[in-house]
Amino acid sequence: MPCACNRSNWRRWIRPLLVLFYATTILVAVPICIWKFQKMKVGMHTKSWFIAGIFLLLTIPVSLWGILQHLVHYTQPELQKPIIRILWMVPIYSVDSWVALVYPKIAIYVDTWRECYEAYVIYNFMIFLTNYLTIRFPNLILHLEAKDQQNHILPLCCCPPWAMGEMLLFRCKLGVLQYTVVRPITTVTALVCEILDVYDEGNFGFSNAWTYLVILNNLSQLFAMYCLLLFYKVLKEELSPIQPVGKFLCVKLVVFVSFWQAVLIALLVKLGVISEKRTWEWQSAEAVATGLQDFIICIEMFFAAIAHHYTFSYKPYVHEAEEGSCFDSFLAMWDVSDIRDDISEQVRRVGRTMRGYPKKKCFPGDPDHNEHSSLLSSSSQDLTSGSSKVPSPGGLYQGFGHTISSQSPISIASIYEEIMNDIPEEQQKLLNPGQDVTINIPEEQQKLIDKRKDVMIDIPEQNAIPDNSQYQDQEQIVTLQALFPSTETSENSMIDTSESQQESSDLCTESSDSSTESSDLSTDP
C-alpha cells in the first residue's frame, strides 16, 4: 500500500490537517498561559510576555499558511525554495523572541541564533534574484557585458567601478555570501564571550566584546545590503516582472529595523534613560533592554507576516504541473546543501586567487557541473545549449530549488590558455605553437593547397603575406591536436578549416577564370 504522503490527493488533506493541528495547539497553549499568568505575580514582565504571546498566536498561522501554500503549489522549485526560507524568518523571529522574553536568562543564547538567520535570509533573497534572471537569461554574463557600465552608488561612489559581466556578478554574490559566514562566526564568538563573562550585551564600551562584535556585524551587514542594492540597480528592468522592490523592502526592513532598534535601545541604556533605578522584574538595565527588544519584535512580526503573505504570494505559481509527493516537498524545504556548495566553491576560488592561479572554467561535458552548481560558480556552457532546463518537482528532493548557474561561451583561446597553464614550462617549450607539428592532411585538401600556391603569383604582396596574428587560433588548435590526438576536432577548428577550404576554392576559381581569359586572348586573331 503506497504511503499517503505520495498519493496525488495529498494537497486536499494537508491544509485541513494544519488547521486542526493549530487549533489543538491553541486549545492546549492558551489555558496553560492563563494558568501561569494567574499563578505568577502580575508585573511588567508578566504582562509583556502575555501580550507578546497574543501577537505570536496571530503571527504563526499567517506565516505557516503562506509556507504551506507554496509547498502545495511547488511548481517552480528554483524560485519557491528561497521564498519558503524567507517566509520562515517571521515565525522563527516570533518564537525566538517570545521564548527569550519569558526566560530572560537564556535570552543571549536564543537571540544570537535568531540573528544568524538574518544572514541566511539575505543570502536566499540573492538566490531568488539570480535564479529568476538565469531562467530568463540563460547567458546572464553576456547580458551583463552588453549593458552600460554601472558606477558605484553612495557611499562607495568614489571607488573604481566593477567591470560589467562576470566580475560584477561574482562580487555582488560574494558581498552577500560573506555575511552568511561572518554572522555565524560572530555568534559563536558572542557565546564564548558570554561564558567568559566579557560580552556585556547592551553596554557600549571598549572593555567588552559586544561593542566590537556589533561594529563588525554592522559593517558586514551594510556591505551585503549594498551589494544587493547595486545588483538591483544594474538589473532593474530585467527584474521588474517579479516586482522586486516590495520583496527587497520586506527583507531589508525586517533585518535593519531589528538591528538598529537594538542599537537604539543600547544607546538609551548608555544615556541613562533605561537605568538600574527601575528594572521591574528584570535583573539589570541591560536585561530590560533585551526584553524590550524581544517584546517589540513579537509585535513587529505580526505586521511582517501580513506583508510577506502578499509580497511573496504563492498565486503566481498556481498552475498545472507534474505532481510531486508531500515527502519530497517537505524535504526540499529543509535541504541546505546549496549553502555548503557555495561556501566550498568560494573557499576554492579565493584559494586559487591567493596562489595566483587563473579562474578555472568547466567544459560543457564536465560531470561536476549539474543542477547542484553553487551560487558563486559561473559555469561555461555551449551557447547552443539553449535555455536552462528546470527540474521537475516530481523528482528527488535533492534537485529541488538549487541555484542555477548562468552560461558563458567557450573560445579556443581560453581552452588553450587553461591547458598551457597546467603544463610545466619544460614541456611547454616542446609544445610551442611555433614549432612544426605533423598533421595528416587529406589528399583533396593537399591538392587545393598546391593549387593555391600556383595562384599566389597573381596576389598582391600585402595580401599574399597576411599578419601572423590572424592565424593565432589555428596555431592553438594545432597545439590542442598535438595534446589530444584522439579527441575529435572542435567546432571552431571545423569552422576554420571550412573557411580555408572556401578561400582556396575561391582562389582556384579565380585562377580558372584567369586561365580562360588568357586562352581567349591567345586565340583571338
UniProtKB/Swiss-Prot annotation:
It comes from the Eukaryota. Belongs to the TMEM184 family. It is a multi-pass membrane protein. The chain crosses the membrane at residues 17-37, 48-68, 83-103, 121-141, 212-232, 254-274, 287-307. Its main location: membrane. It is found in: Membrane. InterPro entries: Ostalpha/TMEM184C (IPR005178). Pfam families: Solute_trans_a. Residues 358-394, 483-525 are annotated as: Disordered. Keywords: Membrane, Transmembrane, Transmembrane helix. Possible tumor suppressor which may play a role in cell growth. Residues 483-502 have a biased composition (Polar residues). Residues 373-388, 503-525 have a biased composition (Low complexity). GO terms for cellular component: membrane. This is Transmembrane protein 184C.
